[in-house]
Amino acid sequence: MSVPQTKAELLLAIDKNFSKLIHYLNSIPSEMTSDDSMEGHAKGTEMSVRDLVSYLLGWNSLVVKWITFDAKGQSVDFPETGYKWNQLGLLAQKFYQDYSALSYDSLIAELQTVKNEIVQLINERTDDVLYGKPWYTKWTMGRMISFNTSSPYANANGRLRKWAKNKNISLK
């Protein structure tokens, strides 16, 4: 799927990639979700399916935070307070830790909830607000949302397919 350029395309990309993601996540046996055998987000690391969901949940929560802060006229620390763009591996580790106490089913439910919040925030905005002007450096709000929702969902789908193939797990 190409990079979304409109609100409708963004919503479609999120829905398509998230639906596939949820299907895959629900196909994985629960006893396999904590196995650190998937290529990690930081070079040379491995992570579990739980970590992958925590990563997505963390980034989706940041999207909600960014948009909410912006709507209130508050300054936004991109990507997150205390982190720079060259520290995304550390931020991934923070996300894994932040959600480590949640069960796998709770992680998926929380991801669904925060994704729904993002969809609501998108629906409350016009194409012009989402794509009409730069929001963070040269990137529009819509592009920043895509960078942290539909694109990572698609990436996660690829990671899960590769991991499942290596583990002889059917994601059908």
Predicted regions located by residue number:
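Short, contiguous alpha-helical
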Residues: 38-86, 90, 124, 129-172
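Hydrophobic packing residues in well-ordered alpha-helices of helical domains and bundles
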Residues: 7, 11-14, 49, 107-111, ...
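Acidic/histidine-rich alpha-helical segments that form the ligand environment
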Residues: 84-129
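A short, mixed-charge helix-start or loop-turn motif at secondary-structure junctions
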Residues: 3-7, 42, 97-101, 138-142
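Short secondary-structure junction/hinge motifs that connect adjacent elements
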Residues: 27-43
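Amphipathic, well-ordered alpha-helical segments in soluble domains
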Residues: 17-24, 59-62, 114-117, 121, ...
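Extreme N-terminal tail/first-helix region
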Residues: 1-24
